Amino acid sequence: MNLQIIILAAGQGKRMYSDTPKVLHHLAGKPLLTHVVETAQQLNPDAIHVIYGHGGEQIKSSLPNLPVHWVHQAEQLGTGHAVLQAMPHIPDDAYVLVLSADVPLIQVETLQSLIECSQRQNPDHSVLALLVAELENPSGLGRIIRNNQGEIYSIVEEKDANEQVKNIKEIYSGVCCTLANNLKKWLPQLSNSNAQGEYYLTEIISFAVQNKTPIRSLTTKNSFEVQGINNRQQLQQLERIWQQRAANQLMEKGVTLADANRFDLRGELYCGKDVYIDINCIFTGKVVLGNGCKIGPNCSLTNVTLGDGCEVYANSVLEGCHIANDCHIGPFARLRSGTQLASHCKIGNFVETKKAIFDEGTKASHLSYLGDVLLGKNVNVGAGTITCNYDGVNKHQTIIEDGVFIGSDTQLVAPVTVGANATIGAGSTIRRNVPPDELTLTESRQKTIYGWKRPAKRERD
């Protein structure tokens, strides 16, 4: 079967009150359009056609790697007109599935069922299948009109509906599937004689009835699947639905969430056994948490891997890090891209790392900046230590070998190497390589000025 998917993404999204095209607004860390494309990909289609219009170049440049065929709708003349733009690129015998880029939570299982529905009960497969739903509040959506036999014979858009029609709870989701040959016959016949002066895709229902093409409907069990996004309130509502579903899936697999309503996933989260996640944590990109990991409140993890038994304390930010087993991080720590910790390491409060590689058992417990640095095993970094890695033009590396003890308030001016088991005295500025097994410090005499008087404030007149 040749399957062609059309995604409608040309709308302006006026009610978003934004310079950003609606389909680029993010839900769970990804643009709305990306959600729909990723769902479409799971159906293994022969092609995905994205109809773009308003802000089209911005959409294409923002999502250059989407595996889609871009189709331009120069004038936004309605959904039927939008689908028509893609038809020259689609074979007559293909099945066409029409989706909307602002309906991001449609499930692949539902779409598979709809495609199957479009192939039933007719030898030549010439069936029009519609995805419908029963909603308590159908305001703004097209209503399904059925005859006395329960057969669909029309869809009436909200702006064209009278009060009797508006009371109908069954709505059309905007998702349909049929043969391309049907659409190629029906779409050129569309009229814009309606309240919005647009060419509605829903008018193809009347042509299907005239041609005696069977119309089948599939009712989704989950109303969120067909909820569209037209304003920021609806975006927030679907965000919470997505997050609640993600939280439930994690808890079903054994993850403990302190509060599922205060959890945010903006990518992929893979957890081992007995993982605990406290409130207000944000996971972005791909995050892997090993067995027994604990994440404290108000933490942000982006593209991070934690080994077994790690604990991240409150208010810590980790990005682009790989952490081995039994490490302790935070509170108030910042681990930037390129940080790697071997097992049993500790990064304490107000420590920032960047491109820092720690070997086993190394600790930096307080108030330090460690950038572009290699640290050996069992190194102790005192409070206030800074690797001075930038000369104004280039970055330079610091190497700290096994067993080094660095006293508090030390500056290591890179490039510099500290030999194994060396000790650096507190308050030192190290500009040259330090020999192993020795005490190195930079000393300035302590001086007392006797009889010195602290300046006193003058009284104002």
Swiss-Prot record:
Family indicated by similarity: In the N-terminal section; belongs to the N-acetylglucosamine-1-phosphate uridyltransferase family. In the C-terminal section; belongs to the transferase hexapeptide repeat family.
Functional pathway: Nucleotide-sugar biosynthesis; UDP-N-acetyl-alpha-D-glucosamine biosynthesis; N-acetyl-alpha-D-glucosamine 1-phosphate from alpha-D-glucosamine 6-phosphate (route II): step 2/2; Nucleotide-sugar biosynthesis; UDP-N-acetyl-alpha-D-glucosamine biosynthesis; UDP-N-acetyl-alpha-D-glucosamine from N-acetyl-alpha-D-glucosamine 1-phosphate: step 1/1; Bacterial outer membrane biogenesis; LPS lipid A biosynthesis
Gene Ontology biological process: cell morphogenesis; cell wall organization; lipid A biosynthetic process; peptidoglycan biosynthetic process; regulation of cell shape; UDP-N-acetylglucosamine biosynthetic process
Residue numbers spanned by region Linker: 233-253
Active site: H366 (proton acceptor)
EC number(s) per entry: 2.7.7.23, 2.3.1.157
Signal peptide coordinates: none
Location of this chain's protein in the cell: Cytoplasm
UniProt KW keywords: Acyltransferase, Cell shape, Cell wall biogenesis/degradation, Cytoplasm, Magnesium, Metal-binding, Multifunctional enzyme, Nucleotidyltransferase, Peptidoglycan synthesis, Repeat, Transferase
Protein name in the entry: Bifunctional protein GlmU
Residue sites binding acetyl-CoA per the record: A383, N389, Y390, S408, A426
Entry-linked Pfam families: Hexapep, NTP_transf_3
Catalysed transformations (reactions): alpha-D-glucosamine 1-phosphate + acetyl-CoA = N-acetyl-alpha-D-glucosamine 1-phosphate + CoA + H(+); N-acetyl-alpha-D-glucosamine 1-phosphate + UTP + H(+) = UDP-N-acetyl-alpha-D-glucosamine + diphosphate
Complexes and interactors: Homotrimer.
Sites where the protein binds UDP-N-acetyl-alpha-D-glucosamine: 8-11, 22, 73, 78-79, 142, 157, 230, 336, 354, 369, 380
